[in-house]
């Protein structure tokens, strides 16, 4: 695909395998980044339209390009630079495995769009949680979902996944009080960051949607340094 030239995709080493969407599905040829496990190939086989060969760069770039064009056509992206900034952010998010949209966006089918962020992917090299990157990811997904909904969605479906993996990264039992505090803080951070971006969009285009996320009050502190403070700051923004 011509859209891959000159992007981050061009430097990604791929490996090819046969994978099916489920054990009973016929396998199809897929190509995923070389370090990724076979389960990622199965996920790509399930998400890619049709039943023929599929590569992650081409399949992802297809929906990214659709969003760029839609955003510009609707006036939700101010020109080529804004469109490319959105695209670059989405490419980086997919490659870092920090988040992905629902099947309706991958397949370009009718339906309410959704986006899920992968919590363990925001663990940083210092052994903490990269709250600024998470806030930025929330903002990017809100903008993406707004474009998917043609700027008319009454609510946006943004969520997070693998809380257990995040807790394991900090050695916290899933059923502990500390884990509950972390979950509440993550929910607060997610909602605050998403509402801040929704507010920015409302300032430019008029209020039209809310973030569909139940948010408990964040705790004063959590076992993850800085997380509770980041959640309170996001909710106060």
Give residue ranges: language-model regions.
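Extended catalytic cores of very large enzyme megasubunits
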Residues: 1-237
């Amino acid at each position: 695909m011509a859209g891959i030239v000159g992007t981050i995709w061009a430097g990604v080493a791929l490996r090819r395998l046969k994978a099916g969407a489920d054990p009973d599905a016929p396998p199809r040829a897929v190509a995923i980044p070389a370090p990724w496990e076979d389960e990622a190939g199965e996920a790509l086989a399930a998400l890619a339209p049709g039943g023929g060969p599929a590569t992650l760069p081409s399949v992802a770039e297809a929906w990214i390009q659709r969003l760029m064009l839609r955003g510009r056509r609707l006036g939700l992206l101010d020109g080529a630079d804004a469109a490319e900034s959105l695209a670059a952010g989405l490419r980086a998010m997919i490659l870092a495995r920090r988040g992905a949209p629902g099947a309706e966006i991958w397949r370009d089918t009718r339906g309410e769009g959704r986006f899920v962020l992968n919590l363990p992917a925001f663990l940083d090299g210092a052994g903490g949680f990269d709250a600024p990157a998470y806030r930025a990811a929330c903002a990017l997904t809100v903008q993406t979902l707004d474009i998917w909904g043609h700027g008319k969605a009454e609510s946006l479906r943004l969520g997070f996944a693998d809380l257990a993996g995040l807790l394991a990264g900090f050695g916290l039992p899933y059923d502990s009080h500390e884990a509950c505090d972390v979950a509440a803080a993550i929910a607060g951070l997610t909602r605050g960051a998403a509402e801040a971006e929704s507010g920015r969009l409302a300032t430019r285009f008029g209020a039209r949607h809310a973030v569909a996320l139940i948010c408990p009050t964040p705790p004063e502190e959590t076992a993850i340094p800085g997380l509770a403070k980041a959640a309170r700051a996001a909710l106060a923004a």
